[in-house]
C-alpha cells in the first residue's frame, strides 16, 4: 500500500481532532506535519487544541502555528459549535507539548520546495495558510500533488444560507486556492453531512476503547449537544475526517468533476462555492466534488484508527 505523504492544515475543532487521530495512525497515511490556522476559534486556542490532541494520543508529529487572521475580512469564529476553547468537552492533562518555532506558511513552502512533488495538502479549516503560501512562493504550485480540502457546498451553506464556515471565514484565501490550477478534491457539506455521528456511533467507539475511543466519545458528545441546539440535528457530522477517509481509500467516496468558483463579492452569496454541477458554463472542471460516501465503510475506518491507539503491552 502506498503511503500518502500529507500536511494536515487544521483549526481544531472537534472534527479536526478526529481527522488528526485518523491521519496519525492509519498505515496508508504518512503525516509529515500539522499546521494550525485560526478558524473554529482564534489561533492561540486552535494551537493549544492541536497540541492537546497530539499529547493525549502520543502523536509525535511537529505542529506549526500559522495565520492568526483571514487575508481580508474581519475574523469570525464558530464558538456556537465548538465552544469557548474551540474544543469544549474533553478534559486534557496540563500541556507540555510545544509548537515548532517555524511559521506554518514557511514550513509548508520549505517542505514542498524540498519535495519530489509527492506531498498532498489536506486543509480542513479556512484556507489562509495555503493561500498565503501560494502567494509568497508560487513555485510550490507544481510541487503540490493534490489538495484534499473540507469546505464549501454545492447546495446550502451552514454559516449563511450560501456559505459553509471554512470558506466564509476566508473567502479570498479560498479564491486563491480554487484558481491555483492545483488538482483539488472538495469534501463539502453535501457529502460531510452524511457522516452523522449518532449516540450509537459514539457507543461503538467507546466499546473499541483506548485513549482515542475516550477522546472520540468526549468530543462527539459535546458536538451532539451543539448540533442539536444550532441545527436541530440528532447527530454531529465529522466533516474534516472525510478528507482522511478519501486519502485512505477514494473508492469509499463518489465524486463528480465540476468547475468551482468562490464568490468574493460582498452580499448574500459572499463565501459561496459556486459549483457548476450541470456544466452550463462550459468551463473545464477544476475540482472533484464529493457527492456520496459509504457510511458503513467510513465508520469502520474510524473504528480501525481508534483501535490503533490501544496499547497491547
Curated annotation (Swiss-Prot):
Answer whether the UniProt record assigns the keyword Protease to this protein. Answer: no
Task: Name the source's superkingdom.
Answer: Bacteria
GO biological process assignments: purine nucleoside catabolic process; pyrimidine nucleobase metabolic process; pyrimidine ribonucleoside catabolic process
User: What does the entry's cofactor note say about binding and number?
Assistant: Binds 1 Ca(2+) ion per monomer.
List the EC numbers from the record: 3.2.2.8
Q: Which reaction does it catalyse?
A: a pyrimidine ribonucleoside + H2O = a pyrimidine nucleobase + D-ribose
Query: Which residue positions are annotated as catalytic?
Result: 11
**InterPro entries hit by this protein:** I/U_nuclsd_hydro_CS, Inosine/uridine_hydrolase_dom, IUNH, Pyrim_hydro_RihB, Ribo_hydro-like
Q: Which cofactor does it need?
A: Ca(2+)
Keyword Hydrolase set for record: yes
GO terms assigned for molecular function: calcium ion binding; purine nucleosidase activity; uridine nucleosidase activity
Q: Which UniProt keywords apply?
A: Calcium, Glycosidase, Hydrolase, Metal-binding
Q: Binding positions for Ca(2+)?
A: 11, 16, 124, 240
Binding, substrate: 227, 239
Can you supply one Gene Ontology CC term for this chain's record?
Answer: cytosol
Enzymatic class: hydrolase
Oligomer status and interactors: Homotetramer.
Q: Which PANTHER family match?
A: INOSINE-URIDINE PREFERRING NUCLEOSIDE HYDROLASE, URIDINE NUCLEOSIDASE
Q: What function does this protein fulfil?
A: Hydrolyzes cytidine or uridine to ribose and cytosine or uracil, respectively. Has a clear preference for cytidine over uridine. Strictly specific for ribonucleosides.
What family does the Swiss-Prot or TrEMBL record give for this protein? Answer: Belongs to the IUNH family. RihB subfamily.
Question: What is the protein name given in its UniProt record?
Answer: Pyrimidine-specific ribonucleoside hydrolase RihB
Amino acid at each position: 500500500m502506498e503511503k500518502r505523504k500529507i500536511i494536515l492544515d487544521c483549526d481544531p475543532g472537534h472534527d479536526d481532532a478526529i481527522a488528526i487521530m485518523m491521519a496519525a495512525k492509519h498505515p496508508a497515511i504518512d503525516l509529515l506535519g500539522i499546521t494550525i490556522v485560526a478558524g473554529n476559534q482564534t489561533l492561540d486556542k486552535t494551537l493549544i487544541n492541536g497540541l492537546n490532541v497530539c499529547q493525549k494520543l502520543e502523536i509525535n508529529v511537529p505542529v506549526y502555528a500559522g495565520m492568526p487572521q483571514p487575508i481580508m475580512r474581519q475574523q469570525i469564529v464558530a464558538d456556537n459549535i465548538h465552544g469557548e476553547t474551540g474544543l469544549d468537552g474533553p478534559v486534557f492533562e496540563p500541556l507540555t507539548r510545544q509548537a515548532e518555532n517555524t511559521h506554518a506558511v514557511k514550513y509548508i513552502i520549505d517542505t514542498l520546495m524540498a519535495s519530489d512533488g509527492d506531498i498532498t495538502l489536506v486543509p480542513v479549516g479556512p484556507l489562509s495558510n495555503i493561500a498565503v503560501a501560494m502567494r509568497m512562493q508560487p513555485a510550490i504550485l507544481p510541487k503540490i500533488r493534490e489538495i484534499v480540502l473540507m469546505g464549501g457546498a454545492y447546495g446550502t451553506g451552514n454559516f449563511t444560507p450560501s456559505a459553509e464556515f471554512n470558506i466564509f471565514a476566508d473567502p479570498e484565501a479560498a479564491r486563491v486556492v480554487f484558481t491555483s490550477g492545483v488538482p483539488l478534491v472538495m469534501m463539502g457539506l453535501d457529502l460531510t453531512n452524511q457522516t452523522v455521528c449518532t449516540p450509537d456511533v459514539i457507543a461503538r467507539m467507546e466499546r473499541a476503547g483506548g485513549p482515542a475511543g475516550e477522546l472520540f466519545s468526549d468530543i462527539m458528545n459535546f458536538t451532539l449537544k451543539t448540533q442539536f441546539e444550532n441545527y436541530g440535528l440528532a447527530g454531529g457530522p465529522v466533516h474534516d475526517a472525510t478528507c482522511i477517509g478519501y486519502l485512505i481509500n477514494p473508492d469509499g467516496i463518489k465524486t463528480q468533476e465540476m468547475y468551482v468558483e468562490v464568490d468574493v463579492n460582498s452580499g448574500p452569496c459572499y463565501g459561496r462555492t459556486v459549483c457548476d454541477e450541470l456544466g452550463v458554463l462550459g468551463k473545464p472542471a477544476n475540482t472533484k466534488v464529493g457527492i456520496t460516501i459509504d457510511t458503513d465503510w467510513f465508520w469502520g475506518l474510524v473504528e480501525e484508527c481508534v483501535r490503533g491507539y490501544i496499547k497491547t503491552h
